[in-house]
Amino acid sequence: EFCTCPWFDPKKFYTDARLQAFNLQQVVDILFPRTASQAQMSAFRGESLYDRKKAILEPSFVCEALGIQGRVDLMTTDCKLLVEQKSGRNMNIETHQVDPGYHSYQLEPHYVQLLLYYGVLQHNFKLSNDRVNIRLLYSKYRPQDGLMVVAYYQKLFKEAIQYRNQLVAASFEIAKEGFEHALNEFTPEVLNVAGTQDFFYNKYLKPQIEAITKPLHTLSPLEEAYFCRMMTFVLREQMISKVGAQEGTNTS
């Protein structure tokens, strides 16, 4: 991928990677101080201290009751700390503008992802809401800005589960009835469920969505029949891989 991208700048990539590594080392020293001076500095910042020997990287977990499986970046075996890392940009941090809905700098998709991970731990281990220190780490930025404490927002967690259930139900319906029954729903207006009309959406997101969806509505009858048949087959295969299939049935 990098060899064929004319925009790729290896020097900048190397510099950015070194900065990320430096920031990560600082975060480790804050959460898991190795010396007395580091521990004092963390305490001065109001940071809780955690046992480095209990830290585990990228543990995988599954919760059948919630229908969630995932892999978090860092946690401790005593379930006192949960950290999800994001290496990309966060414009809230760069512009010093908090999210108006949450009064903090985290981005909602990342917040939702972390809440779902925490929901699994809470359900599987019967944890109280104040048992786990939940953190989002934007490692592109120094820890003072990028290491964020986030709260367990139960309303947002329930909304995420509800939205996931709606997606699953829609996927089952399309797989059963055929993709042609949903083709007309693939428009920017329908997909923009939040009704966003800000500059970023109209300048960047909407053109990308239109580039994908607009050709779907200009297909010839033969092209549409082939495309819908293929999409139905692919979706059914995906559903079978996730939930299994009854013996004796097929996806043809």
What kind of region is each of these model predictions?
Residues 50-164:
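Mg2+/Mn2+-dependent nuclease catalytic core
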Residues 21, 32-33, 46, 96, ...:
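Short, flexible coil/linker elements and helix-boundary hinge sites characteristic
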Residues 8, 12-23, 148-158, 203, ...:
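Alpha-helix boundary/N-cap detector
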Residues 2-13, 140-152, 211-217:
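Charged, low-complexity surface segments at secondary-structure and domain boundaries
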Residues 40-45, 81-82, 86-89, 245-252:
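Acidic/polar, low-complexity linker and loop regions
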Residues 31-38, 121-124, 167-174:
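Solvent-exposed amphipathic alpha-helical surface segments
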Residues 155-252:
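Accessory, charged alpha-helical segments in nucleic-acid-processing enzymes
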Residues 1-79:
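Metal-dependent nuclease catalytic cores that hydrolyze phosphodiester bonds in DNA/RNA
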